[in-house]
């Protein structure tokens, strides 16, 4: 399948009123409005970010656009920081979050997750001259920087690190290379992409989780979302079967993250 073009609209910290109510059938409401309101950060390359022409691009952007096409609607993108994404979903300000969200037992208690569309490992990065940190166990008593309420923050804290809240990977790398934090955690593919763009960046990856995390789309739980969940799952299955997910993965990550290896 060919890579889909990017022509949808984008708004900053705002959402369409069509996503603000809680209809009896969310899928019917979306298809009647002709819009699928999608929330993402827009500042996490290569998941969602602005290119040199300030166009919103990325794996999550194109995956959600392909899903919207399967549903017969247009995507409307809402950009927000990580900490606000779930609050906005809870409030019904948008229909779904497509932002490299890892499925966890705790999140699954609150949200209905779709079929995974990505599989990633969490990696640990330090400055190139750091000889103290070689594993996650070495984080005890160290300082890291990550988005608050992220799985990366939770993992760092579980190993005894103090976590400084930060919004973007770019800011995190700046803190790390300046020596203001000891380490940081993120998706392995995000670090590799950063190093591909900035080959002279002063950091190295020293460890990563053995088990892959499942990346999926969270929806609000409830009967109103049941048909929407089924429709998105069907769309993801079709996009995997026809090779679209693989193609988009290789475009943005240089490898296929759409299937569990």
Please name every model-derived segment.
Residues 10-12, 16, 61-70, 150, ...:
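Extended ligand-binding regions for polar small-molecule ligands
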Residues 34-40, 136-149:
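Short loop->beta-strand "edge-of-pocket" segments that line small-molecule binding or catalytic clefts
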Residues 25, 77-87, 131, 148-150, ...:
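Short helix-initiation/N-cap motifs at beta->coil->alpha
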Residues 4-8:
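C-terminal motif of bacterial Sec signal peptides marking the signal peptidase cleavage site
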Residues 65, 69-70, 78-79, 83-96, ...:
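Short helices/loops that flank or line small-molecule/ion binding pockets
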Residues 18-100:
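Extracytoplasmic small-molecule ligand-binding "clamshell" domains
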Residues 119-126, 188, 192-234, 255-261:
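Periplasmic-binding protein-like
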Residues 20, 127-143:
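Flexible hinge/capping segments at coil-to-helix
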